[in-house]
Amino acid sequence: MPSTTLPSSDVDLFATDTLVDPYPGYARLRDAGPVVRLDRYDAWALPRYEQVGAALRDHETFSSASGVGFGAGMNELMAGGVLASDPPHHTTLRVILSRMLMPRALRDLGPSVTVAAEDIVDRLATGAEFDAVSDLAEAFTPRFVADLIGLPQEGRDQLLEFGASTFEGLGPVGERTPAAMRQQKALLDYVTTTAARDRLVEGGLGARVWEAVDAGEIDEAAAITLMMAFLATGMDTTILSLAAAVRLFAQHPDQWDALRADPSLVPNAYLEVLRIASPVTVFSRVTTRDWECDGITVPAGDRVAVMYASANRDERKWGDPERFDITRKPSDHLTFGVGIHACVGQNLAKLEAHALLTALLARVRRFEIGKPEFIVNNTLHGLSKLPCRIVT
């Protein structure tokens, strides 16, 4: 039966406590309704799986062209990029990215990823304590992204800061916003100087972006936005998911034992990690026309919070959603999105994750972890630190 009252909530999606532990607040929003008014942000929230999926598939009603964040500054900076655009411009950018990042385009990268995964696991499987974030996930992922793009060695130490600041800046204006905006300007400077066209390695993804300019597919401004997208969104989500995998398997040793018994479950296990520990929590859209749900009308021109991480724990979709179960087969999780804005880099993320999990399976009997610490970021959730020891 449609709702007869306007559901609203005082849950603050961007309060520090929520960012560190978002799931209780998400559950309250799901219980409040399929569409919930967030008065403090003059926005609506879609916390349930069905409505999140519907919004992501309906780009004509839920537009990205006005930005996917909640603050005007970052939305203006990202305008016209692959995240913050609609067709036909988005289609042009997407075609260029897709042909670079499809599985067949990444096939040659596989052996080097496997070797690197085995090398890093060998170095950490000594019985000594290490940080699963900085020593494992952050030590593994950035090198592939940087090499794949063809970046010069200079300035690579800035890459992680670029990504975190982008996701931070997508939240509403707050005390951390100025630092995030400064990093965005530093990212633009990096792309136009340190990683300018004439400094990129021939044959890398960056050089191929500029080949699209030469072919008349895009202009130079679009090439810069694509380069910024590579650097801003190409690493953090994978890093966070890899660290989450270690935490989850340490906390659920029965699931690690099950994976060791049947390594063919690696792809499925990674999907379950992504479902239960979604690195990206929320983006926004703006409605282009009135949209009705459960008797509630969201007016045209309103901003809507599309809650990926909440949808992935929706009790209406998933049986016992708080349980980590590598046999669940959650192929329809929404961590990578769906529709025209589905994550174009998901094949690279899967390649890296599958290689690292496979390397860990070969050496690790169990993980012993200390107290996890979590990042504070407006649109990302995950670990900032995880003391860990590998038992072989």
What is the role of each PLM region?
Residues 1-392:
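Cytochrome P450
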